[in-house]
Amino acid sequence: MQLSKLAFTSTETTGFDGIVRKFTDIYMAVFKMEKNLTKEEIIEYYVNNPCMGGNIYGVQQASHYYFGKDVKDLNLVEAAQIAGMFQSPNGYNPYINPNDANERKNTVLYLMKRHGYITDTQYQAGIKVAIKDLLKGGTTSVNEYQGFIDTVVQEIIDNTGNNPYDVPMDIYTTMVKSKQDIINKFYKSYNFKNFKDKGKELEVGIGVINNKTGAIIAVGAGRNKTGAMTLNVATFSGQVKRMPGSTAKPILDYGPAFEYANLSTYGPFIDDKTPYGGGNMRNFSGGYSGFMTMRDCLRKSINTCALQAFRLTTNEQKKEFAAKLGVEFSEETLPDSYAIGAFNGVSPVQLASAYSAFGNNGKRSTPHSYTKIIYRETEEEVKPVIVTEQVMKPQTAYLIANVLTSATSSSVHVSGTSIATKTGTTSYDTTQLRKFGLTSSVIPDSWTSSFTSDYAMAIWLGYTDGLTKETVKKKHYLLNGTATSERIKIQAWLGNKIYEKNAKFKHPGGISSAKVELETIPAQSPSDFTPSKLQGTFLFIGNTGPSETSQRFAKLTDPQDLSYNINNKSLTLSWTSPGTPSAIDTDYLTNWFKSNWKIQTDKYLKKRISYNKKNIGEFGFAIYLTQGTSSTYVGWTKDTSYTIDMNNYSGLYDGAIIKSMYSIFKSNASSGRKVVFTIGEADITANDVTINVSNQNVTLSVGGTYNELNKSSISSINYKGNDIKGDVSSLSVTNSSITDGSGENVAPSKVTEKAGTYKAIYSVSFTYKGVNIAKNVTQTITVE
């Protein structure tokens, strides 16, 4: 009946199915097997069918695998070892669990003595022999694909309750050999030279998911794998999973905020003291940066901003969003610590599956390592249940991908492919660190989770045995700086080989791009004069972008009610002020910061006032005297009147312009208001000016074409040694007369009809500093 149980029926032991299985065992044993097989054949079938550890089946294979000999050549101790493995072949595998295997061997020897099969002398001699000393070579050869096999086996057990090592079946896996071979090569060849003992005990768990199907295409189940069904660091199956650190931020913080709160890549957030757990949230850097955009918050992994984003959505919204990504919580209320990934936990495969939705326009499929199994005895085909669903809006997925693309190291590069990356680091409790005399630079986990539009890959770096006296003594722990540097190298090593070329994230529509003036809350468009360093372009869901233009640097309002008074050489100008602009008005700013900044209001109000004093200055007015279209700057004042001593200015002026203007930041000065008057005396006459033309003497042929002078013919206008051509206005050139050698007038069109010398006189007129000037220039024309 034991044989029928192992070979032909299910493993169910409880309930109605258990009763059915028991009667089936009896039926198979009594009516089928014992009628058709001899007892010797039954025993032979029994010992040559079961799994004996890993991929070893039957006692003959086991004899060669463990002891390098045929089963008929085994000694008493070796035979006792194999006999004891039937109950738990992997648990009593001497390569994997030598101590448990030795105890099991001793139990078998004791039972053999008790039932009279061996003597006490044989028993005493047998228990003194350590089974590890009898093993072939003392080590095991592990199938290079064992990690993926283990992943598949565990999933089948979880899904069906049947162990492929016990129940014969054909399994169709999702493994892509070329991708798995890359990870296998990484395990064999990567040099962990920056770690103690070259990282001998260091583990790297890896999970790679096909975004569109959910298929697990490759895993890194462990660098130090010693056999089948040992610790799998790709899935942490049956183990406590690891804290994800900041890789949780897209899942619990920013993803839900995009989905439910219409967060944009602008945000914004205030990186400063944020109440948390009876104190304040701390950043890894130990400092704060103040105003930050959402893009920078996630890209730089700022904890305070993550906590603020976490609080933008309800508890139910966060739990629902995470659950759809395969990260479920039993807690009714998620504590604030989860905002920075301080929870147990996730595995690389689980994290890669969650991130696959970000690369697939918000769609996620159930992660799976096999597509179907066929039971050999019944030929029954069973497929895993795979659900594909839209777990978030396509816009949410795209925004996360867009932001995280800018967080990818330049060393990770695949031609034509956009790669998005989020890293994560966890920390030990300070009490635990103090216990072993360690600093906060010692960390338990270092993560990299990245994705393209095709694949998602999560990498975990760490030690599996935690902090103990032994591990601390051997320095088997991560140092944050080393781990951070190494994870970038590992991501590049793997990503540059696993990711395919020309994979771009698909823009889903429903997203608008808009320029924003930084430090505006809510987002406002920059004005024409906003400094470029205070501008940025960001993405918004739908039409939630800026609807107003910021007035902080907007063009100032002109003064009103201009008047003047002339007293001899004294000119007094007066006007009405439009009022202090809100951008530098302390009362306005106080109310604005209280209403919008929320965090550390007084601190950032003072910072803004200080910025204004250094970069904008005081509000006042600039005064200019005008001469036609040209103007001369006179001075600046905070007052609403200004007196000019005209003895200091030469020339004739036709008015003045008053502009609202800051004392330092002048770009956004108002257009200005003009008051008209006449003051001063002209200090320029035609006699003071010399006009030069480029073709003052010209030679033409009879029958040729004569071109009259025009404005472009004027090469320079000299006044007091300076060329003032660029400063004049209303420049014009007109023909006065053309005469031949006898003094007769000649029309311009007749000049080249016969040979001779001609004199052309042109009148050049212009306005300079309010004075109108007219002067003749002469051109000599020779016709041959």
Question: Where in the sequence are the language-model features?
Answer:
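Conserved catalytic neighborhood of penicillin-recognizing serine enzymes
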Residues: 1-13, 139-141, 263-318, 335, ...
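Active-site SXXK
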Residues: 42, 112, 183, 214, ...
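Short, well-structured active-site flanking segments
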Residues: 57-60, 120-122, 258-277, 315-320, ...
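A penicillin-recognizing enzyme superfamily signal
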Residues: 173-196, 208, 219-221, 227-240, ...
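Serine/threonine-rich, repeat-prone extracellular segments and beta-strand-based repeat modules
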Residues: 722-768, 773-779
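Peptidoglycan glycan-strand catalytic modules in the bacterial/periplasmic cell-wall system
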Residues: 1-118, 224-227, 301, 311-312
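Non-catalytic structural connector segments
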Residues: 119-173, 179-202
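Soluble, non-transmembrane domains of envelope/secretory-pathway proteins that act on or interact
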Residues: 423-710
